[in-house]
Amino acid sequence: MKYIITYWTNGDALVRRVVETESMDAAIELLKEDPQEPLAQLKDVRLLVEEKNEN
């Protein structure tokens, strides 16, 4: 399944990423391990994860 992950970075940039994982939880785990901006280092976590329609 593909998921769209939307979040704000510490530099106030809005990031939208499309990831393909088996679950929404797995998509969030990918963010936690992101070497560029790990989820744990974000100052204000406003996170949206939604399923991506294949239409």
Where are these regions (language model features)?
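Short aromatic-glycine-(Arg/Gly/Cys) micro-motifs in beta-strand/loop hairpins
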Residues: 1-12
